[in-house]
């Protein structure tokens, strides 16, 4: 099968990676192929259904593939690790999709690499299917994200903390896998030439319009800050908690990447944490905008030598961008909140209107997704909204203020903005448990709903319901991939 690889990272950035083969797997089996994505990439889904097990397990890579493990560093929970890198993933190449966009293809769970740090480099079935589901859920919500092209069972049992688990490999598609941590890797070694080469490559690939800017590296820093501020605002608007916002998990492209311990919040609480390793709540839902700025500061540090030859002037230039991050984020968040609330135009009191609703939701632990969805019905009838609040009168004073700001077509706009279906934790776990037992039908049904999250259907009612009382209080997620 022809993939038409054009591997610019391997060609232009020698020394930024290690050539490495995928580990052998005993009995690969294609579990799921993302046929719409395959077509978007200009690939033949029917042919991939037949040959995908061999290709996406790394057993028989297509002609032109160049498997490599990328080097990067990163701050993990605030502590700097000078060498991380692809410890269980291989970039196999780049292709141009039907829209003319360059896309990375990466095998995740393909075995040990020189960056594995003692781990086996493999991925278990559950985490692979989880990333597939959540990535497609984010895509359905219109949020920039990496996506899964395929999931392959390897036929190899893996020993994990919870016992023996079947092995699997995810084929991930991304605009690129360049991270803040990629810049940090070379900056930590004072290799300014490679920091510059990486910046030039990232500009050419993601922000080509900046190449002719008076100060292209400063413009690049600003563009990444803008892309990430918009991304995190969109996470917050759907109640998404990434769970591990380390600098090696922040892309230069502005895509969401690495769905290890992520989850969607149900009852609204800014302190919500699901990740089993986030013991201090560093990456709690409400902290994500602050971590956004913290991570961008680390990128700024790596770029300082490119911003100006004079250290003081370079710092001032970096700070001039950093000082805008809060306003950038708030602007995107407020614009999104106005859309969620169906407001007409923009008025000064809109932020207070939104914050007062959130305060009531927090006090009542109201479900994030259903509250905004049922507000569309509350334009004319609040009968389905009130039961979401323990005190039915909690919004008594707020509703008239909100209705006074509504656009004429508010209900229609709100239904197109506020999803009815998200990847609720209990439904994800049910689908994964069934998959472990050999039944992928629940996975497929959930995936179908998540691909069309704004269209409410009677036969999908179960996917809209919150978890049983107390489920999320004890629910924990893990870095499985």
From Swiss-Prot:
InterPro entries reported for this sequence: SelO (IPR003846)
Catalytic activity field: L-seryl-[protein] + ATP = 3-O-(5'-adenylyl)-L-seryl-[protein] + diphosphate; L-threonyl-[protein] + ATP = 3-O-(5'-adenylyl)-L-threonyl-[protein] + diphosphate; L-tyrosyl-[protein] + ATP = O-(5'-adenylyl)-L-tyrosyl-[protein] + diphosphate; L-histidyl-[protein] + UTP = N(tele)-(5'-uridylyl)-L-histidyl-[protein] + diphosphate
Pfam hit, one: SelO
Cofactor(s) annotated in UniProt: Mg(2+); Mn(2+)
Gene Ontology molecular-function annotations: AMPylase activity; ATP binding; magnesium ion binding
Signal sequence, start to end: none
EC numbers, comma separated: 2.7.7.-, 2.7.7.108
Annotated residues for binding of Mg(2+): 249, 258
Residues at the catalytic site: 248 (proton acceptor)
Binding of ATP, residues: 85, 87-88, 108, 120-121, 172, 179, 258
Domain of life of the organism encoding this protein: Bacteria
Chain segments annotated as transmembrane: none
UniProt keyword list: ATP-binding, Magnesium, Manganese, Metal-binding, Nucleotide-binding, Nucleotidyltransferase, Transferase
Family assignment from sequence similarity: Belongs to the SELO family.
PANTHER family the record matches: PROTEIN ADENYLYLTRANSFERASE SELO, MITOCHONDRIAL
Function as written in the Swiss-Prot or TrEMBL entry: Nucleotidyltransferase involved in the post-translational modification of proteins. It can catalyze the addition of adenosine monophosphate (AMP) or uridine monophosphate (UMP) to a protein, resulting in modifications known as AMPylation and UMPylation.
Name of the protein in its database record: Protein nucleotidyltransferase YdiU
Gene source species: Cereibacter sphaeroides (strain KD131 / KCTC 12085) (Rhodobacter sphaeroides)
Gene name in the database record: ydiU
């Amino acid at each position: 099968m022809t993939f038409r690889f054009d591997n610019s990272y391997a060609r232009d950035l020698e020394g930024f990676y290690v050539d490495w083969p995928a580990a052998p797997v005993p009995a690969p089996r294609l579990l799921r192929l993302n046929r719409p994505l395959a077509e978007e990439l200009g690939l033949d889904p029917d042919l991939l259904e037949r040959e995908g097990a061999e290709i996406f397990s790394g057993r028989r890579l297509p002609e032109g593939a160049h498997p490599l493990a990328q080097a990067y560093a990163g701050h993990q929970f605030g502590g700097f690790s000078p060498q991380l890198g692809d410890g269980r993933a291989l970039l196999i190449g780049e292709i141009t999709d039907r829209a003319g966009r360059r896309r990375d293809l990466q095998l995740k769970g393909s075995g040990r690499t020189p960056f594995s740090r003692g781990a086996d480099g493999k991925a278990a079935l559950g985490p692979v299917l989880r990333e597939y589901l959540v990535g497609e859920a984010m895509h359905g919500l219109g949020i920039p994200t990496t996506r899964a092209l395929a999931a392959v069972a390897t036929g190899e049992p893996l020993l994990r903390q919870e016992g023996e688990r079947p092995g699997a490999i995810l084929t991930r598609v991304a605009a690129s896998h360049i991270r803040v941590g990629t810049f940090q890797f070379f900056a930590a070694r004072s290799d300014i030439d490679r920091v510059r080469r990486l910046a030039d490559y990232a500009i050419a690939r993601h922000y080509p319009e900046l190449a002719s800017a008076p100060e292209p590296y400063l413009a690049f820093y600003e563009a990444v800050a803008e892309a990430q501020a918009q991304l995190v605002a969109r996470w917050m608007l759907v109640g998404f908690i990434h769970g591990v916002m380390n600098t090696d998990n922040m892309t230069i492209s502005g895509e969401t990447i690495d769905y290890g311990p992520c989850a969607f919040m149900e009852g609204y609480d800014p302190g919500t944490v699901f990740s089993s390793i986030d013991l201090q709540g560093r990456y709690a839902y409400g902290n994500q905008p602050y971590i956004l700025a913290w991570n961008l500061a680390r990128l700024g540090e790596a770029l300082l030598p490119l911003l100006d030859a004079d250290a003081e002037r370079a710092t001032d230039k970096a700070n001039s961008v950093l000082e805008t991050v809060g306003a950038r984020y708030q602007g995107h968040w407020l614009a999104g909140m106005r859309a969620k609330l169906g407001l007409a135009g923009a008025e000064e009191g809109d932020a207070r209107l939104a914050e007062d609703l959130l305060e009531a939701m927090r006090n009542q632990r109201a479900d994030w997704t259903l509250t905004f969805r049922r507000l569309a019905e509350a334009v004319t009838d609040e009968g389905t909204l009130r039961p979401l609040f323990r005190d039915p009168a909690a919004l008594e004073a707020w509703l008239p203020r909100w209705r006074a700001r509504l656009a004429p077509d508010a209900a229609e706009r709100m239904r197109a903005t506020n999803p009815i279906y998200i990847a609720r934790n209990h439904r994800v776990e049910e689908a994964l448990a069934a998959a472990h037992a050999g039944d992928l039908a629940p996975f497929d049904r959930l995936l179908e709903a998540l691909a069309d999250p704004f269209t409410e259907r009677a036969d999908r009612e179960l996917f809209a319901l919150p978890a049983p009382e107390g489920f999320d209080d004890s629910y924990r997620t893990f870095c499985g991939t």
